[in-house]
Amino acid sequence: MNGLRERGCAQRPRPARATAAARLGTLLTALLPVAAPALAAGYPPPVEGDFILKDFRFASGESLPQLRIHYRTFGQPRADASGVVRNAVLIMHGTGGSGGSLVREEFAGELFGPGQPLDTTRYFIVLPDGIGHGRSSKPSDGLRGHFPHYGYNDMVQAQYLLLTQGLKVNHARLIMGTSMGGMHTWLWGEQHPQFMDALMPLASLPAQISGRNRVWRRTIIDAIRHDPDWKGGEYQAEPPSLRTALEMLWLMGSNPVLRYQEAPNLARADEVIDAYVAHGMQTEDANDLLYALAASSDYDPGPGLAKIAAPLMAVNSADDLINPPELGILEREIGRVPHGRAAVIPFRENTHGHGSHTHAVLWKQHLDELLRSPQR
């Protein structure tokens, strides 16, 4: 399966991107390189590929003649005597991230090695780059502000087609995701209730984006859209509003204690945020971020929670500014999921606010327990 560039669109030169420096899933955590190579962690490097979806139609009515979905896989699929794949695991990243942003010591290093919960000798692990992210088709490839407006439902549909058509996976042992990927997990359970044995959404809520979670997203969206240097998405240099976006992402991505430890006085705070923004201005794209945040507008799993048939374990953290437990949403809504359970990780020295979703040591015991549930 070959990669592509959008038809009829010349690419403007851009600096090289660091896919491990992701926005909400990992950029919100920290703009850091991926940890040591996979082999050093005891699991093999991923196999990478591109799946091309022809004439993909978005819920908006827009379409692309070719939609590229990039992916990484670990391990090999195994089917039973009836041809049903029994060991596939789909893991979906957060906003602005990529599948590669999860191939790092604190996530894959805790899960993919020998004897670990998702040992790659036992499981076939699929890490896709969502629409608009990583090396999948995205605005900065060339269409810029003319890229189709995608939503979370479009992203889930593309993931489903990648598994079923591209990788010939007809069943999943587990579907899980972090942040945006966690929200996708809820949608997967509703839209394809018989496809998986188990579900694990991390750092997400089964409800429409609202309150502070909507407002911080709107702050970034409005800053970019009302920036005259954005030029309707046709800029040649990143608009100044990307700085505002990066500052907001830094604010929301961790907990106040960690941020204070990183920046304990005025001078140090300015140094830290200046360095973070300077790096992001070289690696991030305003259109890509704008589209990625706007994509959450169609997220509304609430009405369909009773459709989820598989055992589901939702995990959030008490110091998550984006999904604060004080709202009581997770505790209230999990009762509507027939086989749903939820846990909130208490605030402690090794939690990372919203970014706790990437630190598997905090929650992998819940994954172990979930994987002990029977296959369906």
What are these regions (language model features)?
Residues 171-210:
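Conserved hydrolase catalytic core segment
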Residues 288-304:
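Active-site nucleophile elbow and catalytic-triad environment of alpha/beta-hydrolase enzymes
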Residues 153-173:
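Conserved acidic catalytic loop of the alpha/beta-hydrolase fold
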Residues 72-141:
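N-terminal cap/lid subdomain of alpha/beta-hydrolase-fold enzymes
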Residues 308, 314-316:
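Short beta-strand/loop motif that positions the catalytic acidic residue
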Residues 340-376:
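Catalytic active-site module of serine/aspartate enzymes centered on a nucleophile-bearing elbow/loop
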Residues 195-279:
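Alpha/beta-hydrolase-fold enzymes
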Residues 321-328:
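Conserved alpha/beta-hydrolase "acid-adjacent" motif
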